[in-house]
Amino acid sequence: MKINQPAVAGTLESGDVMIRIAPLDTQDIDLQINSSVEKQFGDAIRTTILEVLARYNVRGVQLNVDDKGALDCILRARLEALLARASGIPALPWEDCQ
């Protein structure tokens, strides 16, 4: 999946996460995480984000994650919505990502 434009998904409310994405000129993934629960769940948050990016074959992006204690399912949903917005597609290709 090609990220064409910057995008934002989520809120800064308790129990939610705000994620910002922007395309990079390289194939690197620049991941910055700021979380109220980073000491306990920082590795799990990072793993979840990288799993979703790998599933949709996303490379060459800068991600800024401001987590306020979001559950894993919320993190995944926000990230998938963000990828759809940033790539300019109306819906994710669910059948291709199994």
From Swiss-Prot:
Localisation per UniProt entry: Cytoplasm
O-(phosphoribosyl dephospho-coenzyme A)serine modified-residue sites: S14
NAD is among the record's keywords: no
Name the record gives this protein: Citrate lyase acyl carrier protein
Keyword line: Cytoplasm, Phosphoprotein
Single GO cellular component term: cytoplasm
Pfam family, one: ACP
Family, per entry: Belongs to the CitD family.
UniProt subunit comment: Oligomer with a subunit composition of (alpha,beta,gamma)6.
Function (record text): Covalent carrier of the coenzyme of citrate lyase.
Keyword presence, Protein biosynthesis: no
Matching InterPro entries: CitD, Mal_deCO2ase/Cit_lyase_ACP
